[in-house]
Amino acid sequence: MYARLAFRHLALRPARTLLLLGGYGVGVAVMIVLLSIGEALLAQARDEKLVGGGDVTVLPEGIDVEVMKTGGLGGMYFSIDHARFIQLQLLASPRLAADVQAVAPQIDGTLLYLRTAGGSERTVRAAGEIPSATRAVGALPALAAGAWDDDAGDARWARPTPAQLRDDIDHFHLPPDELTAAERASWAEWHYFNVLSADRKRWAFITLLAGGDIPNGRWGGETLVTLREEGKSERRFVAYAPSSAVSLSTTRVDLAVGESRVTLLPDGRYDVHAIARAANGSGDMVTVNVVVSPAPRAYFPGAALGGAIVSGYAVPALRADASGEICASGACERFDAAQAYHDHNWGVWQGVTWEWGAARAGDYTFLYGRVDTPESDRGSLILYLVDSLGFRSLFRPSRIAYEDARTISVNGRSIRVPATARMIDVRGDDTLRVELQVDDAIGTDMRRGNERGGRGAAMAHPYFIQMKGSARLTGRIGGHPISGAGAGFFETYR
């Protein structure tokens, strides 16, 4: 009977009947699609590779979750750069302690190549986790047998001691094999320290450097010390050492250059000892014996560049104190918890110039910089800001607005140098304004070398300008105002 009624209705009103049947079919199709999507979402919500046992999963920017799950080409080699820095300074930092209970880093499905003792090579997929962290976020897998606990490598990654952290970011490097002979000859790597007296009138630049075709070519080391009193001439001291008198490590901070050395103490402080003779041939000596104590969490983990230039830069002690003694020409000055700074540079520096500065500003400390090469446009300028809880924010000012209203003499030539500088940036709701006032400046003709390690024979801007001055910052971060003032050192080229 129902079939007869349906066919009669179709015969009497075929258009309306077909429209109703079509609508019903579309409705069924939509329902099937929605149920399929819901099932997929439920499966993803239960997938431990995505959930990780916690409330939030952090993935690299731009990664497609479906591509990652299916192993597509776009998900083969993704990674989070400086993952340990993100863990220690962001996700597991004291700043978020009230909101983040636990953090667990995980590597899943990484492609590795395994070479057996017999010489054959196989491709394998590997995963990595830190057991204690995975347990803390509730994602510990069921163990059929045995135990799964942190080993020494896990503990060093997740909970490094101050000394371990600095060994990891402040060790030395060997020149890459792909460098040309000329590039290997211009390779240089150094520890740099500066120390400022309590009245901000006297300061020292201290560098221990290894350079050349390390380790099998022609290379050696230098110790360079510059002492300066505001408004007076600088005193430069230098000592050279052959490669046989240089000891460096690709896993540790420690460096020895002749009679000078930088030694990392077990508690993460730096013992700096330097001996050098006056560069003017007078025979005067300088002896540096200071211990540099980095402030907790005030460091920049490092960045490496490739392409037109091969270089790297890390700041293990963005904010630090120095205690000890510097003696020159028979007179000694004692420093007790004096403002100090330490960075580490490596790479090929032929013809390279830079903008750089680091200063305290009240409770804040900032670092800014940019590297420029003759073959490329200007690099990107960044400003890195920390406070007592560690990393605070990263800004990218478009430029440094210098006012070259000072004049200094370099080898008898008058050079115009900055008297003030200004940087401004707005990133979303966050704002920053930094104003620099230069109190003192010295210049070096880079064709003659300097204690910062750069070298260049034919540079458009060959005069390396080192400045000491005051800094003031203002702005807002995360809806809160920030401000501070202090002193620092700045560098540019003219």
Which positions does each model-derived feature cover?
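N-terminal Sec/SRP start-transfer signal
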Residues: 1-31
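A short N-terminal beta->alpha junction/helix N-cap motif
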Residues: 20, 25, 29-33, 74-77, ...
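Acidic/polar N-terminal loop/beta-strand segments that form early-domain functional surfaces
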Residues: 22-24, 59-61, 106-108, 129, ...
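Hydrophobic, regular-secondary-structure patches
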Residues: 32-125, 132-135
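Short, glycine/acidic-enriched capping/hinge loops at junctions between secondary-structure elements
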Residues: 68-71, 115-116, 137-140, 205-208, ...
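Structured soluble/peripheral alpha/beta segments that form catalytic or ligand/cofactor-binding pockets
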Residues: 146-494
